[in-house]
Amino acid sequence: SMTSKFKELMSQFKDETAPVVTVEGKKKLAEHYTFNQGWYDALLNTDMVLNTHPEGQKLALKPEKSRQIVEIGVYEGASTCFWSDFYLDHPESRLISIDPFTGSEEHHAEPEKYPELANLELIARGNIAKSKNAAKIEVLKGFSQFIYPELCLRHGAEPWIDVLYVDGAHDPTSVARDTVLYVPMVKQGGLVIFDDYGHPDVKRGVDNALNAFASAESAIFTGWQLVVKM
C-alpha cells in the first residue's frame, strides 16, 4: 500500500543526514537583507544536497522552470527571499506566501529573544521587496487554515502547486493540519519541503499526517529539512 511505501521511505532516509554545507556569498546576502533569526541556511543546505547527493538529484529543482510555489510561514521573509532569488526567474513563476505575522508559541514564550516580533510584517515586506523577483510574490496575511478556503475557491479542485514549503507553527497539530490541507494541492511530481523536520514535534505531525493519505514517490532528509516528492 501507499502508506507502507511511505513508512519504508521514511525509515530509509530518516537517519541519513546529509553533509552540512557553508555557502559562499552568505555574508553578502546577510548584508542585503535584515534577518534577526537564522538565515536561509537550511534551504541553502537542502538546495546543495539536492544538487550534489545521488538520491537528492532525483528531487532537485531546475531554476529556469515555470513553477507555482506556496510557502506557509514567512516570519522575516528569509525563505521567501530564497525562493525569489533562486527559483522564480521564469516569467510565469509565482510564489504565494502565507503568514499571520503574529509569531508563534515558541516566540511568545520568550519574547525578549525575539525583538523583531513587534515589526514582523514590516521587516518581512521590506526584505521581500529587495528580493530578485519581488513582483511575482503575493503575501497573504492570515493563518494558513483560514487562507486555505480562499485558495480552493481561486484554484479549484485540481492540484496546482509545484513546490510547497511548510514552515508554520511547529506544534504537531498545526503541522499535521497544514500537511493535510495543503499537500493534496501539490501536483504529482511536485515537491513538499518540511522545515524543522529535525524537531520532534514537527516530525510527529508530519509523519502522522503523511501516513494518513500521501502517496510519496521518494523522500530525503537533508539534516534539518525533509523533502518529499509526490
What name fits each language-model region?
Residues 1-230:
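A short alpha-helical cap/connector motif
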